[in-house]
């Protein structure tokens, strides 16, 4: 029970690390010098709540153009409109913007005027989900910490797109049209602080190359990935949450050491083509292997031997840390091998 609580706290810590710095900056006390308290100009197309003078609500209004943004605005909500372009002019005075939501519009790359976004020197959050983008927009402000581009038509990432985005911690590219040739060896160069990368629901057949070294959460579900190169995880030594559900991974496509990577705490390999349980690290806590083609569990292969346990033996006095194991949807039949329970003494749930 204590171990599960520790794991949950660790998950919360990681999530907080990705979000909290941005959230603190977004919700910090506003400096009265940033805007004049008597200046409550509000575009007629939008709503400016008196109790929240730094927010501008223009969502769900059938807008085709972005109105002029007053200088006091920090939070801009323009989602669910008919906007096709992002010109520079409406943002001329919007020097304090931290948050822009442009989800569910009709924005194309050709419609984004160069400099329109990069001029926003304090912008932290940019939401452009459910638009018509075919490549990651550029240039973007160096200050940006979260970029949400899910459900577009992105198939290209121009060279140098991320070169100045050293503050970016979260990049969401799920449900786009990315294929393997969208990536070069230096595609992610510049993302020194990226912690969460989501490229689920694309058309990848290979693992993306040279990911940022600080990546902790990597989501690649619902692609067509067939294999993982040897030593692939050496480049991302901090990865803790790895999701590869709904791919085409086979036993032959895995590295020789499997997933024996000490940083990985949560590993999801559901709905693949595995016939064996891969090697895992003694640190791993959650393992999802449901809906594969596994017929039996060879405990002697997957159980870390005493020599494989980390030097910090106190935390491993009860053996490996595995607590949750899903094996349902395979060809395994009960009962659970007793050797499995003997090896993984902290197991709290096994689903067959």
UniProtKB/Swiss-Prot annotation:
Binds keratan sulfate chains. Cornea (at protein level). Increased expression in the stroma of keratoconus corneas. Also detected in trachea, and in low levels, in intestine, skeletal muscle, ovary, lung and putamen. Residues 33-71 form the LRRNT domain. One of its GO terms (cellular component) is extracellular matrix. Disulfide bonds join 42-48, 46-58, 303-343. The keyword Disulfide bond applies. Residues 1-20 form the signal peptide. Keywords: Disease variant, Disulfide bond, Extracellular matrix, Glycoprotein, Leucine-rich repeat, Proteoglycan, Repeat, Secreted, Sensory transduction, Signal, Vision. InterPro entries: Leu-rich_rpt, Leu-rich_rpt_typical-subtyp, LRR_dom_sf, LRRNT, SLRP. It is found in: Secreted, Extracellular space, Extracellular matrix. One of its GO terms (biological process) is cornea development in camera-type eye. PROSITE patterns: LRR (PS51450). LRR repeats lie at residues 72-93, 96-117, 122-142, 143-164, 167-180, 193-213, 214-235, 238-258, 263-282, 283-304. The keyword Hydrolase does not apply. It comes from the Eukaryota. Glycans are attached at residues 93, 167, 222, 298. Belongs to the small leucine-rich proteoglycan (SLRP) family. SLRP class II subfamily. It is linked to Cornea plana 2, autosomal recessive: A severe form of cornea plana, a rare ocular disorder characterized by flattened corneal curvature leading to a decrease in refraction, reduced visual activity, hyperopia, hazy corneal limbus, opacities in the corneal parenchyma, and marked arcus senilis often detected at an early age. CNA2 patients manifest extreme hyperopia and additional ocular anomalies such as malformations of the iris, a slit-like pupil, and adhesions between iris and cornea. May be important in developing and maintaining corneal transparency and for the structure of the stromal matrix. This is Keratocan. It comes from Homo sapiens. The lineage of its organism: Eukaryota, Metazoa, Chordata, Craniata, Vertebrata. The gene is KERA.
């Amino acid at each position: 029970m204590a171990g599960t609580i520790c794991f949950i706290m660790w998950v919360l810590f990681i999530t907080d690390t990705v979000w909290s710095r941005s959230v603190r900056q977004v919700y910090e006390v506003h400096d009265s010098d940033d805007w004049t308290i008597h200046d409550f100009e509000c575009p007629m197309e939008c709503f400016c709540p008196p109790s929240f003078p730094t927010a501008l609500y223009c969502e769900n209004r059938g807008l085709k153009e972005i109105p002029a943004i007053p200088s006091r605005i920090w939070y801009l909500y323009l989602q669910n409109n008919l906007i096709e372009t992002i010109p520079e002019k409406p943002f001329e005075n919007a020097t304090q913007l931290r948050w822009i939501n442009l989800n569910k519009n009709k924005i194309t790359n050709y419609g984004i005027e160069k400099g329109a976004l990069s001029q926003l020197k304090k912008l932290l959050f940019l939401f452009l989900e459910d638009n018509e983008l075919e490549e990651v927009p550029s240039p973007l402000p160096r200050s940006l910490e979260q970029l949400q581009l899910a459900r577009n038509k992105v198939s290209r990432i121009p060279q140098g797109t991320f070169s100045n985005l050293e503050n970016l911690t979260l990049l969401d590219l799920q449900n786009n049209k990315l294929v393997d040739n969208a990536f070069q060896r230096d595609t992610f160069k510049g993302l020194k602080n990226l912690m969460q990368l989501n490229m689920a629901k694309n058309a990848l057949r290979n693992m993306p190359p040279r990911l940022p070294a600080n990546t902790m959460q990597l989501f690649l579900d619902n692609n067509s990935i067939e294999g993982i190169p040897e030593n692939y995880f050496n480049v991302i030594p901090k990865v803790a949450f790895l999701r590869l559900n709904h791919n085409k991974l086979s036993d032959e496509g895995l590295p020789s050491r499997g997933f024996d990577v000490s940083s990985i705490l949560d590993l999801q390999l559901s709905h693949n083509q595995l016939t064996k349980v891969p090697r895992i690290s003694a640190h791993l806590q959650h393992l999802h292997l449901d809906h594969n083609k596994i017929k039996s569990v060879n405990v002697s292969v997957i159980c870390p031997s005493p020599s494989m346990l980390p030097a910090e033996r106190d935390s491993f006095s009860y053996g490996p840390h595995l607590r949750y194991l899903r094996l349902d949807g395979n060809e395994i039949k009960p009962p659970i091998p007793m050797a499995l329970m003997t090896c993984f003494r902290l197991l709290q749930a096994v689903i067959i």
